[in-house]
């Protein structure tokens, strides 16, 4: 049985920043994550994706962001329990006992759920025989954009992932078609502005009012993508790569059985300190929901700070927290975190 102050479920960017915040407040942390490495979707799904809304970084790729967050958290010696899920919760007086899928037992006064989308997988387009092309010509995630150099690429979707990858790949691809069923994109306005600017150079062709209809190719090698509009008119796009970005399937797994208020795969929290309906359990980042919620990494960072400051008195048996700025605190010697 491990004993700690805080258990953080999820080792994505928000979970890692929560480790740092807890450490700054003198709290010990154990971190549970279902993946084999820390970083969440930033590492597993899109390590080379550029991120534009992190303060002080005009642009930073996801992998580098995780590297910096892990470095920031390292002085506080977090213990990582990777490749395992939190499956059982037992409340005992003023503490919790958590059991993982590897039978790891952890006793903690506070739980911070920073599980992002929970267990995740791509929403796949309903195209005949698409599985024949997967991993060779059809990709749902990008972990090495260099493999797309000189290719003719169809990107499908209208959100941030579709627009950001169209922009990012436009400087190495031969041609990009961005297919979206509407004329309006839901990505960040500045990203849409950049997209339309690049489209004027013909590096990106916007195919709006169309949806994916069929794939054509041989031996797992794509030759063209057929798209169709609302009047059933079709168009053939010569392409050897398809990147469908239609979001992720969300699955809270065992968290859904913990007695938390769950709505549409999200955990309801109060908007002051992000505490759930169970005292001592908080939810932050994309998994948390409240009125006015913004799904930004930056928002998750702020939620981590607020929730852990609120949890201080629970961890330290009612002791009042005397707020200090980080410039007055000593983070101690840097040391390596521990993975279990």
UniProtKB/Swiss-Prot annotation:
Note on how the cofactor is bound: Binds 1 FAD per subunit.
GO MF, one example: flavin adenine dinucleotide binding
Cofactor(s) this protein cannot do without: FAD
Keyword rRNA-binding applies: no
Source domain of life: Bacteria
Similarity section: Belongs to the ferredoxin--NADP reductase type 2 family.
Protein name: Ferredoxin--NADP reductase
């Amino acid at each position: 049985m491990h004993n700690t102050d805080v258990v953080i479920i999820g080792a994505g960017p928000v979970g890692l920043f929560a480790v740092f915040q807890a450490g700054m407040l003198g709290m010990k942390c154990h971190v549970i994550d279902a993946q084999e490495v820390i970083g969440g979707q930033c590492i597993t799904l899109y390590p080379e994706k550029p991120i534009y809304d992190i303060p002080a970084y005009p642009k930073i790729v996801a992998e580098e962001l995780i590297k910096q967050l892990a470095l920031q958290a390292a002085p506080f010696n977090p213990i990582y329990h990777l490749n395992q899920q939190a499956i059982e919760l037992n409340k005992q007086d003023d503490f919790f006992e958590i059991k993982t899928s590897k039978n790891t037992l952890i006793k903690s006064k506070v739980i911070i759920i920073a599980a992002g989308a929970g267990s995740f997988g791509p929403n796949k387009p309903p195209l005949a025989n698409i599985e024949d092309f997967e991993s060779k010509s059809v990709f749902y995630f990008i972990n090495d954009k260099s493999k797309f150099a000189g290719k003719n690429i169809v990107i499908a979707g209208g959100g941030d992932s579709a627009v950001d990858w169209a922009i990012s790949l436009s400087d190495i691809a031969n041609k990009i078609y961005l297919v979206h069923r509407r004329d309006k994109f839901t990505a960040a306005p500045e990203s849409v502005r950049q997209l339309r600017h690049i489209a004027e150079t013909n590096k990106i062709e916007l195919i709006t009012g169309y949806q994916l209809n069929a794939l054509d190719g041989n031996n797992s090698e794509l030759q063209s993508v057929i798209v169709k509009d609302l009047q059933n008119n079709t168009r053939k796009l010569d392409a050897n790569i398809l990147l469908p970005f239609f979001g992720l399937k969300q699955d809270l797994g065992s968290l859904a059985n913990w007695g938390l208020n769950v709505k549409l795969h999200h955990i309801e929290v109060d908007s002051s300190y992000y505490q759930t309906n169970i005292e001592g359990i908080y939810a932050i980042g994309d998994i948390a929901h409240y009125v006015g919620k913004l799904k930004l990494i930056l928002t998750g960072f702020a939620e981590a700070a607020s929730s852990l400051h609120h949890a201080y008195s629970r961890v330290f048996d009612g002791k009042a927290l005397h707020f200090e700025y980080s410039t007055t605190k000593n983070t101690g010697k840097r040391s390596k975190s521990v993975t279990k």
